[in-house]
């Protein structure tokens, strides 16, 4: 594992404009330093900085500008690719290369270096009064780059079925007030900016004003996971078991060619071989744009809604008690470890601050709708934390969960209505490979909400916690993975009525 750099100086030659070719060596050195430093601090303390080669590679020789070739990894072995397939690692490396280029240009031209910010966090929308809302967020400091702080924020809006976003304002603060005079779904992104450029957009949150002006429900986006596929090593076999856990691309992926087919370490050069079935397929990932999808299901019932990131709930910026019903989006959120685990466990479905906030809310009568593929197994499985199992049994109403590798992609509700969900790789919806099959807790008063198509495996339950406490609907088929909008609205309606009636 490690990074190699290649440049070409032509024994002290110059480019056509007179620039000395030694600048290519300087560029290579700066970028390699940046990659080495950032990867070591963020992912792998033992990441190696390998050689720099002054060689006549055509890609280094032909361009008439300072040029570098970066061989990020020594070769595509399993240890390398645990990082190489991870979208977060790719972002860190890509940002390191960008920062190295910016440093080179700043030094060469004698300019102040300012690095573009990271996306904002703790994004939330609050209804301040009828038709009036406030967007709030927080900047994300970059521990690797002190210059990357925002100096302003750009507010982007999408209305209804618009295909894209348009700018509606700028601010130097971390709040923005808006007025809504219709019952359309309005979606928003915040883009941090400074003299160095703009950050990636924030997650997308949404709102809708109910026609009758009634109190909105709260949609919480807890699906922040991006990751490479699951991996294993046991009994002479190793590799990526992407059929069991494909991982989650950032928005979409165009690099996947096919599932691994050769897992035997003894297979020599064939070890790690994969198919080519998906070489021309765009694979959908986490779009960070699901509150509007859930909101459309709520709107079909005539409901208004606001939305917030789970981190805003965890920080206390959003009070769940202000809302009669909370809809928690978990998608494919799951405890995840990258590489050797320097970053620890990330993307827990119910991190402790969120778990405690949900429990307080439910204990005081708040009703919960929770959808997520791993919503049960992540708090009952091997990576569960102290307090997780109590939460699972007493709030969710489950004591355990197993994966179901069904190929049908169909489930049905307690009325016998069928629903199709995304269970194959495609360019529209992320894949749901193995939804949790639920085991109800012995002391919980649960009823079945949904089963797989065969009717024998429970994937949804209603936990009746008693008259003084809130009701909980749990579905391990993510709502946004249901392919038909009318079907999404139907199952949301079923869950909503189940938790808000018979109290």
Feature locations, PLM:
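Short, surface-exposed beta-strand/loop micro-motifs that present aromatic residues
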Residues: 55-61, 436-437, 454-468
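Beta-strand-rich modules
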Residues: 177-198
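A glycine-rich, often tryptophan-bearing local segment used as a flexible ligand/cofactor-contacting loop or short
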Residues: 332-446, 450-453, 487-491
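Aromatic-Pro/Gly-enriched surface loop or interdomain linker
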Residues: 203-325, 329, 496-503
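Active-site microenvironments of hydrolase-like enzyme catalytic domains
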Residues: 1-29, 53-76
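Short beta-strand segments within Ig-like beta-sandwich modules, predominantly Fibronectin type-III
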Residues: 166-173
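Active-site-adjacent mobile loop/cap segments within catalytic or ligand-binding domains
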Residues: 45-111, 476-479
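Pro/Thr/Ser/Gly-rich low-complexity, intrinsically disordered linker/stalk tracts
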Residues: 103-147, 197-214
């Amino acid at each position: 594992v490690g990074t190699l750099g290649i440049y070409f100086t032509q024994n002290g030659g110059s480019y056509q404009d007179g620039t000395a070719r030694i600048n290519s060596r300087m560029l290579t050195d700066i970028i390699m330093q940046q990659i080495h430093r950032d990867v070591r601090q963020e992912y792998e303390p033992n990441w190696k900085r390998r050689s720099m080669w002054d060689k006549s590679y055509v890609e280094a020789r032909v361009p008439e500008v300072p040029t570098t070739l970066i061989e990020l990894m020594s070769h595509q072995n399993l240890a390398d690719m645990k990082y190489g397939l991870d979208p977060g690692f790719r972002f860190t490396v890509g940002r390191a290369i960008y920062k190295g280029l910016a440093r080179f240009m700043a030094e060469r031209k004698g300019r102040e270096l300012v690095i573009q910010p990271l996306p904002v966090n703790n994004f939330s929308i609050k209804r301040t009064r009828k038709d009036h809302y406030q967007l709030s967020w927080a900047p994300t400091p970059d521990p690797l780059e002190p210059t990357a702080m925002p100096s302003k924020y750009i507010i982007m809006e999408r209305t209804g079925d618009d295909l894209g976003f348009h700018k509606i304002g700028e601010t130097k603060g971390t709040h923005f007030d808006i007025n809504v005079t219709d019952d359309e779904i309005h979606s928003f992104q915040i883009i941090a900016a400074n003299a160095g450029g703009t950050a990636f957009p924030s997650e997308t949150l949404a709102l809708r004003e109910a026609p009758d002006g009634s109190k909105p429900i709260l949609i919480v986006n807890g699906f922040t996971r991006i990751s490479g596929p699951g991996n294993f090593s046991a009994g002479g076999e190793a590799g990526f078991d992407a059929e069991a856990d494909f991982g989650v691309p950032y928005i979409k992926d165009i690099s996947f060619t096919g599932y691994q087919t050769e897992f035997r370490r003894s297979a020599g050069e064939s070890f790690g071989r994969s198919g080519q079935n998906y070489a021309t397929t765009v694979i959908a990932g986490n779009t960070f744009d699901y509150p509007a999808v859930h909101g459309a299901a709520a709107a079909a019932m005539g409901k208004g809604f606001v939305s917030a990131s789970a981190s805003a709930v965890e920080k206390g910026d959003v009070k769940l008690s202000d809302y009669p019903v909370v809809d928690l989006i978990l998608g494919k959120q799951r405890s995840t470890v990258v590489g050797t685990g320097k970053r620890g466990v990330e993307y827990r479905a119910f991190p402790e601050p969120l778990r405690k906030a949900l429990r307080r809310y439910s204990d005081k009568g708040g009703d919960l709708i929770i959808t997520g593929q791993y919503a049960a197994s992540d708090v009952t499985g091997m990576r569960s934390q102290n307090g997780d199992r109590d939460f699972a049994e007493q709030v969710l109403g489950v004591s355990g969960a197993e994966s179901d590798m069904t190929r049908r992609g169909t489930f049905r509700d307690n009325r016998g209505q069928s629903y199709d969900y995304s269970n194959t790789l495609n360019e529209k919806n992320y894949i749901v490979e193995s939804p949790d099959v639920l085991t109800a807790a012995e002391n919980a008063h649960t009823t079945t909400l949904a089963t797989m198509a065969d009717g024998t495996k429970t994937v949804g339950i209603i936990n009746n916690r008693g008259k003084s406490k809130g009701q909980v609907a749990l579905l391990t088929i993510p709502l946004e993975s249901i392919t038909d909008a009318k079907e999404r609205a139907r199952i949301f309606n079923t869950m909503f009525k189940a938790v808000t009636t018979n109290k």
